Amino acid sequence: MIRTIAIAVFSTSFICAVKVAAAAQLTNAPPKNGEVVISWNSRGTLEIANQVTGPWITITNAANPYTNVLTPAPRFFRLNQTVDATTLRKKILCGYQGWFRCPGDGGNQWIHWSRSTSTIASNTLTFEMWPDMSEYTHSYPAAGFSYPGGAQAYLFSSQDQQTVDRHFDWMMDYGIDGIFLSRFVVTVANHPTNVLVNVRNAANRTGRTFALLYDMSGQPTNTLFTQLTSDWRWLVDNLHINDDPRYLHHNGKPVLMIWGFFADRFSTNLAHQIIDFFKTNAAYGVTLIGGGEWWWRTETTAGWSNVFRRFDVYSPWNVGNYSTIGPNKYASTAYWSQDLAAAASAGMLYLPVIYPGFSWDNLMQQPPGTSKIPRLGGDFLWRQFYDAGNLGLDMAFVAMFDEVDEGTAIFKVSNTPPTQAYFVTYEGKPADWYLRLAAEGTKVLTGERPNIATIPISP
């Protein structure tokens, strides 16, 4: 009779109880009969309790940090995968828009689902992928849309805490570190906080990390600096956002991404004014990530070469940038190695943008398939992780978690969307396929699995 039991624990939500039959030592030696050996993901810590309600105690083993042998007693154990929020290193973070609204969520508008705030119809759609709604506890009927079997189709609102909780539960369950929450400068005059509070609550509950990404698109240049800095001051002074234990920090400062540094959008004087404030202000200073043009290194517009080399981290926007290899399109990554060297010579870190594919035909009112950059079953995404791993990069920005508008979402999407309009699907791959691929890519960049050119898991 084999009495030794080996159990691997990979999910925070997984709690198991065992009855250990014999004494065991904290040792790296092979187990003896009657011992229960536990192994777990290196990105987490094992917690153990005598009852399911706790108290939970972290256990360690100096000989082998990711295995342990339990002492005799009924034991409950779980994996605590709280993300280290003190550093950008070994972080793969997703962009998170959080901008979807539905009538009945406290407002009375379709926002980012339809170009008409009062109506949703096949000719008003502004999104490309229908989310898999099977796990949401709060949803809203989309009148006139039904699934292939005839059932009413539903959508979610980012205003609901339950929606954001569901998204963060997926991040926790699949091993995704957290997000950059988009905050659009053009909308922050009155300091909206609802989605930010939802994210903050969910991150603290699940042990994920988050940081803000200010998107400067559309804000008039004469008010850009004031509106941007006033909102950050307000968040620090009133919400104490930088003191949240789940808010991402690096080198002791809160991390902030500011996106929209393109040479044709505003002057270098304004760019330097923004950078000066966020890098030098004693009370409101941050570790500053600049997001903008992917050709930053070779930008020839006067003065911009210096601008692009002043950040703490630079993240080139690569979505839509691809090369054709044979019959297929693949994300352009050949420039990353020179970018990495240029960033290092300027004293900056480099945060590449990785995306799974692209399509925005409904948004742009184009014939179906016009703009599509196919996902190739996940190979389009995986090759970017592979290329980043070959360069020794240990951080990345995945664009995006919930962006169904431009078909770049990695969260759960329906393969059987409503039949009343054109939608992109995961082409038969499971709804969680891209969450799983992002998790495996995370392991590559953090050194937890070998870097190989082909997708290492099966659907």
Model-identified regions with their sequence ranges:
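Glycan-processing catalytic domains of CAZymes
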Residues: 82-459
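Short, composition-biased motifs enriched in small/polar/acidic residues
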Residues: 5-10, 16-82
